[in-house]
Design a protein with these regions (language model features):
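Charged catalytic cores and adjacent phosphate/nucleic-acid-binding surfaces used
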Residues: 190-344, 350-365, 376-406, 417-580
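Hydrophobic pocket-lining residues within nucleotide cofactor-binding pockets
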Residues: 187, 413-415
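Core AdoMet radical
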Residues: 370, 411-412
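Short amphipathic alpha-helical interaction patches enriched in hydrophobic/aromatic residues
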Residues: 14-21, 150-154, 438, 442, ...
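Two-metal-ion RNase H-like nuclease active-site motif
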Residues: 181-183, 338-342, 412
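Accessory alpha-helical DNA-binding modules that contact the DNA backbone or grooves
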Residues: 14, 24-230, 242, 251-252, ...
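Charged, compositionally biased N-terminal leader segments and the immediate start
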Residues: 1-22
Length: 580
């Protein structure tokens, strides 16, 4: 069973426990286990079979037993027990942006509303006002959340879809006769959300591959099955499509089914001008002679272009850049040396000790990590005195670690509604990495949000603007913002913008990355880790940066520590963005 499916079940158990039993300890335990498993790079099923689940943080014997049931039978008795206590539509209400378990419990138990449709009717009729602490403003907010929820229906976050795809590919590669198996579609282009999963396999005999695909453990229903292709719906709710190709056509099919449609049209138009024809079967001349198709490189070479990375294939200038020899050398995860936004247990929502974070970073090959716990505006955040003590603790541990890795003393400081920072500037001035971010009043108009950020960036003590648009994929839209104005001030003040690699954020967006590059503003790619296991999430931020045409020279945390420290000093990032 795929890691993502196990994590989904554990998360659902946590939601149901909160609604039915209210045991906060058990709820937290299941939520943490779900998060750890969702982000674990290895196979959870394999760990179970090897008796090694206990090696994962937060996975005790009780939860390990539930995971074992899932791996062995595909079912979980605890989930079935709890699901019987709650109408199916109640769980869907929990997926609405800004509608938490306490609100859902009140809506369900006080008003007898059992699904999203009933909730919408109650908001429109005013009946929702009968529930405690739910007024007219809240009703309008819930209606907006319902509208956004429906607009996003049927799409899955990149990291979850990738987890399902990789698990399926691992099984398909074990089928005798399979020469190659790859993901295609928007998932290969690393779009932040995907509507389905496209898999391509190169094999001379398609039959065994199709049969293996339709019999995978995560399949809920077979939607279509033919000699060389099949479609299934996974238990996770997303559709997966398989096509089996002869090896000589695999590259052509991989290019075609990777897309985007706009990119494919642009490339076909170029081919026509050259007297060629491109299809999913290959590149052909006017006489029907096949010029290539076994690899994507052959496809591009036949039309006089170098290989274009999948992340760029959106018809946003990549073909013109390739023709002119100006394709960027996109940043890679191996280029990154550090992580400049990491939380420890010193503030409210961090779950790992400093030593755990250092060990995890060392294992991942990181050279430096900035510890940036929350300031006092967040629950249990640090005031100036506690921040100074925490910084001293970080520096003492850094001295003992002797550069394996280096720990930098920092903070994630709130930008208050006025634009002032949550801590005095003198408390921030001695820190090596100050990440400033908005966490409140997200519904303010663009002009107010922009001026709020501009004032914060102009303070002289901020190094990085964290998760610059505040979005959370699938649950919260970005707040309104005049990005051009923010970039102008960031360049002037020497502030970098963050590409937050948290899979639920991915903020800046790819479009924002291109805008930052054009404005001469560097970015940092950071995990915003709240647990040591999150440190492996950098790849998601790297993919956003690649979609945004960024190179290593555009990303500050590709720098050796000595140069990074120099660039983080006042004004250095803006000068350096063009100088590397």
């Amino acid at each position: 069973m795929e890691n993502a499916e196990v994590a989904r079940v554990l998360g659902e158990i946590a939601d149901l426990l909160e609604l039915t039993e209210g045991n906060a300890f058990k709820v937290r335990a299941y939520r943490r286990a779900a998060q750890v498993i969702d982000l674990h790079p290895g196979s959870i099923s394999q760990l179970w079979r090897e008796g090694r689940l206990g090696e994962l943080p937060g996975v005790g014997a009780h939860i390990a037993e539930k995971i074992g049931q899932l791996v062995e039978t595909g079912e979980c008795r605890e989930l079935a027990r709890l699901s019987a206590l709650v109408p199916p539509g109640v769980l869907e209400m929990l997926r609405l942006e800004g509608v938490g378990p306490k609100t859902v419990e009140a809506i369900w138990k006080k008003l007898g509303i059992e699904d999203v449709a009933g909730l919408e009717e109650a908001c429109r009729s005013g009946r929702i006002l009968e529930a405690p602490r739910l007024g007219a403003t809240r009703a309008r907010s819930i209606l907006g959340a319902i509208e956004r929820h429906r607009a996003r229906a049927g799409r899955m976050l990149l990291h979850r879809a990738l987890g399902h795809a990789e698990a399926m590919l691992d099984r398909l590669r074990e089928v005798p006769g399979v020469l190659r198996a790859e993901v295609a579609g928007s998932l290969r282009r690393r779009k932040e959300t995907v509507g389905d999963i496209d898999l391509l396999v190169a094999a001379a005999d398609a039959g065994p591959v199709v049969r293996a695909f339709t019999q995978l453990s995560g399949v809920a229903a077979v939607l279509a099955e033919g000699p060389t292709k099949a479609s299934v719906r996974l238990r996770a709710g997303i559709q997966a499509d398989l096509r089996v190709l002869p090896p000589e056509s695999f590259g052509a099919a991989l290019h075609y089914f990777t897309g985007s449609k706009s990119h494919n049209i642009a490339l076909r138009t170029r081919a026509v001008r050259l007297g060629l024809k491109i299809s999913e079967y290959g590149v052909f001349d006017r006489g029907g002679r096949r010029l290539g198709g076994a690899t994507e490189e052959e496809m591009f070479r036949a039309v006089g272009l170098p290989f274009i990375p999948p992340e760029l294939r959106e018809a946003t200038g990549e073909i013109e850049a390739a023709e002119a020899g100006r394709l960027p050398r996109l940043v890679e995860e191996s280029d990154l040396l550090g992580d400049l936004h990491v939380h420890s247990r010193a503030s409210s929502d961090g779950r790992s000790e400093l030593e755990e974070l250092a060990a995890a970073a060392r294992a991942l090959g990181r050279k430096y990590v900035a510890i940036t716990d929350h300031s006092r505006a967040r629950p249990l955040g640090l005031d100036a005195e506690r921040l100074a003590e925490h910084a001293a603790t970080i520096r003492a541990l850094d001295a003992r670690l002797d550069g394996r890795p280096h720990l930098l003393a920092g903070v994630e400081v709130d930008i208050l509604p006025t634009g002032a920072l949550d801590l005095p500037e003198e408390a921030l001035a001695g820190l090596e990495c100050v990440v400033a971010a908005i966490h409140s009043r997200l519904s303010d108009p663009a002009s107010r949000n922009t001026e709020r950020i501009v004032r914060a960036l102009s303070s002289g003590v901020v190094h990085v603007l964290g998760h610059p648009t505040g979005r959370q994929l699938g649950t919260r839209d970005a707040y309104a913002l005049e990005l051009e104005r923010v970039l102008e001030v960031a360049r002037r003040e020497g502030v970098a913008l963050e590409v937050n690699a948290m899979p639920e954020r991915l903020d800046l967006t790819d479009v924002g990355c291109r805008a930052a590059k054009a404005a001469g503003v560097p970015v940092v790619i950071s995990t915003d880790a709240h647990d040591a296991t999150h440190l492996q999430n950098l790849r998601y931020g790297v993919w956003v940066a690649r979609r945004g045409w960024l190179e290593a020279k555009d990303v500050l945390d590709t720098l050796p520590l000595a140069e990074l420290r120099r660039r983080l000093r006042r004004g250095a990032p803006a000068r350096g963005a063009r100088g590397r």
